Amino acid sequence: QQPSVTLKLEELQSLPTTSYTTDLPWIQQSSEFLGVKLSTLLTHVYGSIPEQVDIGSLNNYHSTLSRKDIVRYQPILAYQQDHHYIKVRNKGPYWVIYPLSQYPELDHNEYHAQMVWQVNEMKIKQK
């Protein structure tokens, strides 16, 4: 079992950022999302990218992301949408974003389910 690590927004912002402009099924038009690549965040916290990561939300929804997908598609943990911090009522404060416009093959339920919003925890899953 990995020890629990709590990161504040300031710590996330100190890591290299990535932005994606993408369409999502839950919003009316393309938006620009700014955040930290999960690969960068996981390497920063754990020293490497684990085989699987469980991402949980404020409403107790959970989804599992694989290392293969994290490395290949480089999803981000977004904290800004269109240059504004994401509020809880708008799916914040953190939202896992895959660049669907860049990878149209991801635009289906399997990957939609992995784009957890209102993220409040990440746990390494042991196989």
Where are the model-predicted features located?
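N-terminal intrinsically disordered, low-complexity segments enriched in P/E/S/T
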Residues: Q1-K127
